[in-house]
């Protein structure tokens, strides 16, 4: 392609959308809540349990990088078979269903975001690999 005779202005940079479909997840550690958004519209909210002070949930902006309908989870001092609806967003941190407790609203996890299984199922079907996960206090 031959060069133009006159310089062309640099195109204006536009921030990319949160995801192709505008969906994103907000994890509020202070209030132990997860919010599902489509652009600026809240479409669902869930009471959750996140990490304890000894095993805190990471903060920052991440993207779901893999989803498992069911898989085992383990770490120092625990093994949990068949954990439902896992969506990992950073290393071993994820959102998932929880069958071993129902104490939602209280930090109890090893760093993951624990949801009721039926609510985790909804979020799992709604979100995609690549969906933004914003985690904050």
Question: Which role does the model predict for each range below?
Answer:
Residues 1-5:
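Extracytoplasmic intrinsically disordered, low-complexity "stalk/linker" and propeptide segments
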Residues 7-22, 42, 52-61, 66-137:
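Exported/periplasmic cell-wall-interacting domains
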Residues 24-26:
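Short glycine-aspartate micro-motif
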Residues 45-47:
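Residue-level detector of high-confidence beta-strand sites
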């Amino acid at each position: 392609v031959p060069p133009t005779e006159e310089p062309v202005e640099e195109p204006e940079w536009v921030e990319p959308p949160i995801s192709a479909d505008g969906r994103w997840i907000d994890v509020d550690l202070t209030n132990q809540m997860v919010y599902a958004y489509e652009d600026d519209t809240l479409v669902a909210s869930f009471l959750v349990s996140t990490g304890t002070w000894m095993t805190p949930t990471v903060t920052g902006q991440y993207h779901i990088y893999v989803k498992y309908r069911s898989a085992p989870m383990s770490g120092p001092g625990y093994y949990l078979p068949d954990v439902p609806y896992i969506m990992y967003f950073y290393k071993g941190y994820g959102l998932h269903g929880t069958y071993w407790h129902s104490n939602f609203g209280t930090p109890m996890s090893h760093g993951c975001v624990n949801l009721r299984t039926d609510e985790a199922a909804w979020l799992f079907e709604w979100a995609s690999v690549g969906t933004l996960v914003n985690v904050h206090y």
